Amino acid sequence: MTQSNPFQQYGITSGLAAAAAAKASVLAAMGTISDYVGVPTPIGLRIEVKVEMMKQIDARSGIAAVRKFSGDNPDTLNGALFESRAVIRDDGLINIFAGEGIGVAVSDGLPVRRGDPAINPVARMMIENAVREVSGSAGFDVYISVPGGEDLARDTMNPRVGISGGISILGTTGIEEPVSGPDYEAHIEYLLQTGRCVSTVAVMCPGNTAMRFAESYLRLHPASFILTGDRIGSAIEMAIEKGYREIVVFGLPGKLVKMAAGVMNTHSRIADARFETIAAYAALNGADRDTISKILSSNTVESAFAVLRSIGLLDSVAGAIASRIVERLRSPVWQIRRILLRHDRFRRQAIRVSPVAGHIETGE
């Protein structure tokens, strides 16, 4: 599937991949072999999914496999093989079992009960609906597995949120968007819901680099750290709704500067305003026309900061921008009582903003 922008591709969620594999294995058990299976989604669309392998084992069972495709979304599970084995039952019941590579809930507060397989309710519904499309009056035991899933899960949020031993089968729409869209927002909400069980602090990190550095910098429970992608504003709103007492925004300047301009979805397709924002605050702090021109001609925020550093204005401009971000996030729209905003660029430059007055420290 392709967005209106031909360079951006949608993918399928782990829930849809599992549903496609399950349906294919049921068809195989019934003696029908096909290269593709159609799977219904909760949003009313039907998705045709390519079947990697499909085989009837005997008159009562079949196996099939589907390879997950994540489109342009950076996803640990892209290319992972979802396998399913279906065995006919005589009582008409459809039972879904988790096999190799599927995690188990080991914490409370998750969408599934402690001790149950990490197959979320909507994903389980998708699997059952896909199977029932072709099962007729027959029942089936369906066993889903992801070879190597335990290793893949180490690079996901599962160890943080209380899923052990493998991946989760997720998805609210069946469709994986290439940027932080509604399906990813559901994932953020899931992380915030589970994190709230163990922490009152939510650390919003727009990217993996910020996430890794935040984890090394802040002494907090692992579930406190939320990878928001571009949906920082939505993540903050959800954290407020879920009763977090403190929200930390921790990221690199390319994302954070946009927030000073009120841009809370930081994807470049939505808005930019980085250099205009830096230039405006540089002008307010005494920068001349030549400096403003250099900032507006910069290719990166770091290069714009270098211009300011060369004339001794970096601290004052960065402080003003940081104060404005804090002001934005403290507005009645957000209703946040306390904000701690941090930016750190490892050893090159560090900016830290206090929650009291937007005080800023910069240094090499």
From Swiss-Prot:
Q: According to its UniProt record, in which pathway does this protein act?
A: Cofactor biosynthesis; adenosylcobalamin biosynthesis; cob(II)yrinate a,c-diamide from sirohydrochlorin (anaerobic route): step 6/10
PANTHER family recorded = COBALT-PRECORRIN-5B C(1)-METHYLTRANSFERASE (PTHR35863:SF1)
Q: Which domain of life is it from?
A: Archaea
Name of the protein this chain belongs to = Cobalt-precorrin-5B C(1)-methyltransferase
Sorted alphabetically, the keyword list is: Cobalamin biosynthesis, Methyltransferase, S-adenosyl-L-methionine, Transferase
Claim: S-adenosyl-L-methionine is one of the keywords in the record: yes
The keyword Transmembrane is annotated on this UniProt entry? no
Q: Which Cys-Cys disulfides exist here?
A: none
List the molecular function annotations (GO) for this entry: cobalt-precorrin-5B C1-methyltransferase activity
| EC class (word) | transferase
Quote the InterPro entries the UniProt record gives.
CbiD, CbiD_sf
User: What family, per the record?
Assistant: Belongs to the CbiD family.
What does the record give as EC number?
2.1.1.195
One record GO biological process: methylation
Catalysed reaction(s) here are:
Co-precorrin-5B + S-adenosyl-L-methionine = Co-precorrin-6A + S-adenosyl-L-homocysteine
